[in-house]
């Protein structure tokens, strides 16, 4: 069974991308060396990795190769303006073709203009869509998981705040109840004292004296033990004829 067609696009996984770069870099350097030996060509190869590391190969001397390239480029561009125009025209045509291919690929991914695709092309498109959907779902699941964890944290904080507020309300209610009971007790004592002072009974008694005619005395009755006053009760003398 033959190898499947590899889609040429950027590798998202950094580890896989580094492994692929290492393998293909070694293969490219090997091919450049073989080309210089087999065809007696002067070859200069410069490669920069995504991290900025330099890899190079030259069949003779890299500086010599670069100088030769610079001189040839200047002769090509400076000697003939028409050639420069043609070069830019080819570059523009290549960019237009790349843009067209990208637009076609985008339409196919959106399910448009599929009539010109064969079974293999459709299978490749389906595989690309499945990979895209898998990546989208994975990203969505990660976002939802993060949001759920954040909501759990917020819920725990709110629950703790509610507990603290409930405790504070209970303390305030207890203090309010104690204050209310004290106020009620004070009001009851005040009312009792007022009733006792306003309803103190009076009694009459007849005082007889040998030297004086009999008289009628008005006096307050003795209050409850421990609450009566030590002052003498007022006397109202009525002399009988």
From Swiss-Prot:
Domain of life: Eukaryota
Nucleus recorded as keyword: yes
Keyword Cytoplasm found: no
Expression by tissue: Expressed in seedling roots and shoots. Highly expressed in young leaves.
Principal location class: nucleus
Region feature Disordered, mapped onto this chain: 216-241
Domain MADS-box: 1-61
InterPro entries according to UniProt: MADS-box/MEF2_TF (IPR050142), MEF2-like_N (IPR033896), TF_Kbox (IPR002487), TF_MADSbox (IPR002100), TF_MADSbox_sf (IPR036879)
Keywords: DNA-binding, Growth regulation, Nucleus, Repressor, Transcription, Transcription regulation
Molecular function per GO: DNA-binding transcription factor activity, RNA polymerase II-specific; protein dimerization activity; RNA polymerase II cis-regulatory region sequence-specific DNA binding
GO terms, biological process: positive regulation of transcription by RNA polymerase II; regulation of transcription by RNA polymerase II
GO annotation, cellular component aspect: nucleus
Phenotypic effect of disruption: Increased number of tillers.
Subcellular localization(s) per the UniProt record: Nucleus
Residue ranges constituting the K-box domain according to the UniProt record: 85-178
CDD domains given in the database record: MADS_MEF2_like
Binding partners and assembly: Interacts with TB1.
Purpose: Transcriptional factor that targets the CArG motif 5'-C(A/T)TTAAAAAG-3' in the promoter of D14. Directly suppresses D14 expression to control the outgrowth of axillary buds.
Name of the molecule in the record: MADS-box transcription factor 57
Highest classification ranks of the organism: Eukaryota, Viridiplantae, Streptophyta, Embryophyta, Tracheophyta
């Amino acid at each position: 069974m033959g190898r499947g067609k590899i889609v040429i696009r950027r590798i998202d996984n950094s580890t896989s991308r580094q492994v692929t770069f290492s393998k293909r870099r070694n293969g490219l350097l090997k091919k450049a060396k073989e080309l210089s030996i087999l065809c007696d060509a002067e070859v200069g190869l410069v490669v920069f990795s995504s991290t900025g590391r330099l890899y190079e190969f030259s069949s003779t001397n890299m500086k010599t190769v670069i100088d030769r390239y610079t001189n040839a480029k200047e002769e090509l561009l400076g000697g003939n303006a028409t050639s420069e125009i043609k070069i830019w025209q080819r570059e523009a045509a290549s960019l237009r073709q790349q843009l067209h291919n990208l637009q076609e690929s985008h339409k196919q991914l959106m399910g448009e203009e599929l009539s010109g695709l064969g079974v293999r092309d459709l299978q490749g498109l389906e595989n690309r869509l499945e990979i895209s959907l898998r990546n989208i779902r994975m990203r969505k699941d990660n976002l939802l998981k993060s949001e759920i964890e954040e909501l759990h944290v917020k819920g725990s904080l709110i629950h703790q705040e509610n507990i603290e507020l409930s405790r504070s309300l209970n303390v305030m209610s207890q203090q309010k109840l104690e204050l209310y009971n004290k106020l009620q007790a004070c009001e009851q004592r005040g009312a009792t004292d007022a009733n006792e002072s306003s309803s103190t009974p009076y009694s009459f008694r007849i005082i007889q004296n040998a030297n004086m005619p009999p008289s009628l005395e008005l006096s307050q009755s003795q209050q409850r033990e421990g609450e009566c006053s030590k002052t003498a009760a007022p006397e109202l003398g009525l002399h009988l004829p």
